[in-house]
A protein has these predicted regions:
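Bacterial N-terminal signal peptides that target proteins for export
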Residues: 1-12
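C-terminal segment of classical bacterial N-terminal signal peptides
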Residues: 14-23
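Sequence/structural segment immediately N-terminal to covalent heme-attachment motifs in c-type
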Residues: 25-47, 133-157
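Gly/Gly-Pro-rich "capping" loops immediately C-terminal to redox-active cysteine motifs
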Residues: 31, 44-79, 155-186
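Short, structured interface segments
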Residues: 41, 107-129
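Axial heme c-ligation environment in periplasmic c-type cytochrome domains
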Residues: 54-70, 82-112, 129-132, 165-173, ...
Length: 222
């Protein structure tokens, strides 16, 4: 019996090692495609964040991706890379100029490896399984709409279509796009991800429980 158990554990270890090796190979292939497509000219992938001033932020051409694997959901990311639609109503780093769109699209053969690469880029600040998502989170909804001015800057889905402001990234479809654990980490430790930003800091204004409710509410957005 001990021999059988040892054999099983050995095979399991080999299988796990093989899976990890394949994942690393896929990520490495994706990195080559990412760099070969010149994606790094607009998106930096080396963390942690180094911006110290508004000039540093304005020098960026596009969102940083060094924590993409903690922020995004893989299936959404792979689909978006093949058919990229604007997430921000306004151009990156602007609150006045509309987003013209036109983000380069990848082929299906390119999008898979690039997704593997981007999903390998994670932040230790994001703890998995922290946010419990339900179909409805009334406390989170009240905070999002009434207690804090989230809807003043972010579009979000409503029964009619969508509502909210235009200056921040749209949250329409956030339930499929964003990892709720990252949303919570971003609310709790915003400077880890964006040392210089326009979004208000809610640390000290909202409790951790409130932030969890907001993250859970955002996760319901379709």
């Amino acid at each position: 019996m001990k021999t059988l158990a040892s054999t099983f554990l050995g095979l399991l270890l080999v299988a796990m090692t093989t899976v990890v090796a394949i994942a690393r190979a896929d990520a490495a292939a994706g990195k080559e495609v990412f760099q070969g497509s010149d994606c790094q000219s607009c998106h930096y992938t080396q963390g942690p964040a180094t911006e110290k001033s508004i000039d540093d932020q304005l020098a960026k051409k596009g969102p940083e991706l060094w924590y993409a694997g903690s922020k995004f959901q893989g299936p959404w990311l792979q689909a978006w890379l093949q058919d990229p639609q604007p997430i921000r109503p306004m151009k990156f780093n602007s609150v006045m100029e509309p987003n013209p769109g036109g983000h380069p699209a990848l082929s299906a053969d390119q999008a898979g490896p690039v997704t593997d690469y981007l999903m390998s880029l994670t932040s230790d600040a994001v703890k998995a399984g922290t946010v419990k998502v339900k179909k409805k989170n009334l406390k989170g909804r009240l905070i999002f709409i009434k207690k804090m001015p989230c809807s003043g800057c972010h579009q979000f889905p409503t029964k009619k279509k969508f509502s909210g402001g235009l200056s921040g990234p749209s949250l329409v479809g956030a339930g499929q796009r964003l990892n709720p654990d990252w949303v919570l980490a971003y609310l709790q430790q915003p400077k880890v991800f964006k040392p210089v930003k326009m979004m208000p800091v809610f640390v000290g204004l909202l409790s951790d429980k409130d932030m969890k409710n907001v993250a859970a509410h955002v996760a319901t957005f379709k």
